[in-house]
């Protein structure tokens, strides 16, 4: 490798010449239901999207995740302190990927409680009011009954989220929450933690408390090796979150992982730790 300073008149061209053949090889090595994650900074993310659209196909774009790589501002910055970094995800064949999920976290479960001592356990709730108006969704407009105050309720402008038959089922299943004394103007629909299947849909904003920071990664390596050796190491927590994503319900415990730029061996560390935690047989 040779340095590619931004003073070079071919700065972006040289970078593209470096990354293009590597991504071609990456695609050829991916399984049909495989995915690739690429960490990149703001300097080249726009170029990388174009290259990936060409190599993998625009339709195989999965997500552009925003990773919070640090949480403290730098007063040495002249304009803005960069706290985040893009993380691109592409699939080899998007039709082979029906869903991507991740395991539920303690943070996600913490929103569930049981203020009314429901025998079904902890729950959270969602609004019953539809953003659409009655004119837009006339089939979702009908009167509701508040059993606590014994009053009929209708929304002045908006429809409900559910058809009347579904509402009647919610009533039979005692899923509507009107408040402790019926004080809510409109009901909320109960969602029970016990009904969750232990997984959730991932979001495209990854906070540092869940995925680590570059500063912590550097400290971990320095503590391990006795001195600073790498400038842009990724935290193992970030890689572990990537590897923990479940594609089509598969936890990927026997997955084969390839890191094209394995400088500090963070990917190897993450693979070995995950295997130790869940008994997997991942290889790298």
Name what the model sees in each region.
Residues 1-256:
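Class I S-adenosyl-L-methionine
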Residues 248, 273-277:
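Secondary-structure boundary motif
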Residues 253-274:
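A phosphate-binding catalytic loop at a beta-strand-loop-alpha-helix junction
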Residues 277-284:
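Class I S-adenosyl-L-methionine-dependent methyltransferase module
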């Amino acid at each position: 490798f040779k340095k590619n300073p931004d003073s070079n008149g071919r700065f972006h061209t040289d970078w593209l010449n470096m990354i293009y053949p590597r991504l071609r090889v990456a695609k050829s090595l991916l399984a049909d239901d495989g995915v690739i994650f690429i960490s990149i900074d703001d300097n080249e993310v726009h170029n990388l999207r174009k290259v990936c659209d060409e190599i993998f196909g625009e339709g195989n774009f999965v997500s552009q995740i925003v990773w919070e790589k640090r949480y403290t501002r730098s007063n040495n910055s002249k304009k803005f302190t960069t706290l985040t970094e893009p993380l691109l995800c592409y699939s080899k064949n998007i039709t082979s990927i029906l869903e991507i999920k991740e395991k539920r976290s303690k943070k996600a479960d913490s929103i569930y409680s049981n203020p009314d001592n429901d025998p079904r356990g902890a729950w959270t709730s969602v609004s019953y009011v539809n953003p659409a108006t009655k004119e837009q969704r006339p089939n979702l407009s009908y009167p509701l009954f508040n059993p606590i105050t014994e009053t009929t309720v209708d929304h002045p402008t908006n429809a409900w989220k559910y058809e009347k038959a579904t509402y009647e089922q919610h009533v039979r299943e005692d899923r509507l929450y009107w408040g402790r004394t019926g004080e809510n103007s409109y009901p909320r629909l109960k969602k029970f933690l016990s009904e969750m299947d232990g997984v959730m849909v991932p979001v495209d904003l990854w906070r540092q408390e869940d995925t680590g920071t570059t500063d912590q990664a550097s400290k971990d390596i320095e503590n391990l090796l006795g001195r600073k050796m790498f400038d842009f190491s990724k935290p193992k927590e970030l890689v572990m979150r990537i590897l923990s994503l479940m594609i089509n319900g598969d936890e990927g415990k026997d997955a084969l992982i390839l890191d094209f730029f394995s400088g500090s061996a963070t990917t190897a560390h993450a693979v070995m730790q995950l295997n130790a935690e869940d008994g997997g047989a991942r290889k790298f």
